[in-house]
Regions:
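Long, internal low-complexity/basic segments
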Residues: 5-90, 161
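Secreted extracellular polysaccharide-interacting domains
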Residues: 57-71, 103-105, 120-130
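Extracellular/lumenal carbohydrate-interaction signature centered on repeated Trp-anchored short motifs
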Residues: 69-80, 99, 130-138
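Short beta-strand segments enriched in hydrophobic/aromatic residues
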Residues: 84-86, 118-120, 145-147
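Beta-strand acidic-aromatic groove motif in beta-rich domains, primarily in extracellular
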Residues: 90-95, 153-156
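Short, aromatic/His-centered strand-loop micro-motif at the edge of beta-sheets
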Residues: 120-140, 147-148
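Carbohydrate-binding surfaces in secreted/extracellular proteins
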Residues: 136-168
């Protein structure tokens, strides 16, 4: 049980596990341990990026984008901006997406061109595509949605950009 001190019976095992913990902690960059309490709450003091600031949100590669964990973009104008690096020979894949089979949106590159798809409950898919391929190199891509307004789910206009230039 937890009331029995296993360390007294197995000091070698304790030393082995302490050593293993330290090896793994170094391997996964968790040392030095940050034992600050209040300071860790403020990203600026803690030395990490602030993921949400005002009406902007910062996402990193591989982050899960759950509906209730990001800014609400429904029924309002908004934009999504991403910095990408396109290899020689082009790129293909998802840049950022939110939602799933029953609704959501995705900003992605397909056939070398930036595309945006809005999935309306699996009933209808609205796709906007760039007119030109995304060239090799570092680029900033952006999707702007201008909401038509006047109530819920009234639609709007999507414009795609490469490095500040409208492409679709």
């Amino acid at each position: 049980t937890q009331a029995h001190n296993l360390v007294a019976d197995n000091p070698e095992k304790l030393a082995e596990l302490q050593r293993l913990w330290l090896i793994e902690a170094v391997k996964y960059n968790v040392v030095p341990l940050d034992d600050r309490g209040f300071e860790r709450i403020n990203p600026d003091i803690a030395g990490r990026p602030q993921l949400i600031r005002g009406n902007s949100q910062l996402l990193f590669s591989g982050m899960r984008v759950s509906e209730n964990c990001i800014l609400n973009m429904k029924n309002k104008s908004h934009q999504v901006t991403a910095n990408v690096v396109v290899p020689e020979g082009g790129a293909s894949g998802v840049i950022v997406t939110q939602g799933g089979q029953v609704g959501g949106w995705s900003l992605y590159v397909h056939d070398g061109k930036l595309k945006y798809c809005y999935n309306f409950f699996g009933i209808q898919y609205f796709i906007t595509a760039a007119d030109t391929p995304l060239p090799a190199g570092k680029h900033q891509v952006r999707m702007e949605f201008a909401y038509d307004g006047g109530g819920l789910a009234k639609g709007g206009t999507v414009t795609l950009y490469y490095d500040g230039n409208a492409v679709g």
